[in-house]
Amino acid sequence: PTDGCPGWTVRDVVAHCSSALMRIVESRYEKGVFSPEANDRDIAERAEWTNAQVVDELERGMTEAGPVIAKAGGALDLAALGEWVHGGDVRDALGEPGAYIGPGLPHALTLLARITREKGCLPLHADLDDVDEPLTLGAVSGERTPARYIGDAATLVRLYSGRPVAGRTFELAGAEAKELNIFW
């Protein structure tokens, strides 16, 4: 099981990712695509597949989705960020180091800042222990004083993706963790 996606196994996360990436590659965006119900259907469709088939689909999706996402002008960036977060879910479930960090972190933080601004999320000023510059997230409208986060980048990613933060050391003032989740 994975902590980041309750009720899902690591295989389920990989099956979801492979399906989501192939939807992007094939431009299959029916109503409700990427909803929890659609995700569960996609996982169920792959239940009888071998692990090798799921991994093959994931590899194809990872290879072919990048150019499609890049050409979409930002419209698929939330899906790209979600796939990166799911990589962290898998590493976390397997006890591997580097869950929600690694070489992709600077890109993920850039996407997170832009996506939260475009979605009109609550404003937040993040002082990250492991990043030199502070990060401004959300939309600064003047209606709400920006919340403040002090902690590491991995925990910030966990907060914005609705992942568990129990046992993590951080400070969050002016907002509740549940207000930050951009995926549900």
List PLM regions with ranges.
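Short, hydrophobic secondary-structure boundary micro-motifs
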Residues: 1-3, 36, 167-169
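Helix-loop segments that flank and shape redox-cofactor active sites
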Residues: 1-9, 67-74
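Active-site-proximal cofactor/substrate-binding loop regions of enzyme domains
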Residues: 5-25
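Short, structural beta-strand-to-alpha-helix junction motif
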Residues: 9-10, 50, 152
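Generic structural signal for individual residues within well-ordered alpha-helical segments
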Residues: 11-14, 55, 157
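Short, helix-capping/interhelical loops that line the mouth of catalytic, cofactor-
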Residues: 19-68, 96
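Structured surface interface patches that mediate subunit assembly and partner/cofactor docking
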Residues: 29-33, 70-184
